[in-house]
Amino acid sequence: MPPRPRFDRRAPVRELPNINERIKYPQLRVVDSDGKQLGVIDRLKALEIANQRELDLVLVSEKANPPVCRIMDYGKYKFEQEKKAKEARKKSHQTEVKEVKMRYKIDKHDYDVRIGQATKFLKSGDKVKCTVIFRGREIQHSNLAETLLLKMASDLEEQSEVQQKPKREGRNMIMFLSPRKSPLIKKDNE
């Protein structure tokens, strides 16, 4: 008995588009390349019209009764669809959770650096996880860590909103910030 192959070596079956002779419906509602309705025509007549114009007959909506076809240049149509999909992929930004770690006894300059990092992450559209790490007996001072995280939230309130308030998680205290959809406008009390 020969050994079985480890994976399927056959080429994947690609679904071919319903164009020209691959359309099997006898009656079709045909739309011109300009968007003008040509009415319900039998398939052979629609193919003849498309061939005269040196264009393709493309099935647009299979579920309609009768199915809707459009006379167009399929190569150009396919190129436009790929271009739109590429643009959509480029515009969609996967939001990540970036982490900013610190101790509750943090120096002013180090705190400013963490604020700068968090601001950069928020401007790029990512969520920020602010973590205060406790070592040894420091965990007794969790109220100081909570104060620090709330101060950080107030310093970043123009760019972010608190998604999760400060809470203890093991030997850490965490808080989540997410970027604001619209910038916060500060009111001057004078």
UniProtKB/Swiss-Prot annotation:
Signal peptide: none annotated. Residues 159-190 are annotated as: Disordered. One of its GO terms (biological process) is ribosome disassembly. The keyword Cytoplasm applies. GO terms for cellular component: cytosol; membrane. GO terms for molecular function: ribosome binding; translation initiation factor activity. Gene3D superfamilies: Translation initiation factor 3 (IF-3), C-terminal domain (3.30.110.10), Translation initiation factor 3 (IF-3), N-terminal domain (3.10.20.80). It comes from the Bacteria. Keywords: Cytoplasm, Initiation factor, Protein biosynthesis. It is found in: Cytoplasm. InterPro entries: T_IF-3_C_sf, T_IF-3_N_sf, Translation_initiation_fac3_CS, Translation_initiation_fac_3, Translation_initiation_fac_3_C, Translation_initiation_fac_3_N. HAMAP family: IF_3. IF-3 binds to the 30S ribosomal subunit and shifts the equilibrium between 70S ribosomes and their 50S and 30S subunits in favor of the free subunits, thus enhancing the availability of 30S subunits on which protein synthesis initiation begins. Monomer. Belongs to the IF-3 family. This is Translation initiation factor IF-3.
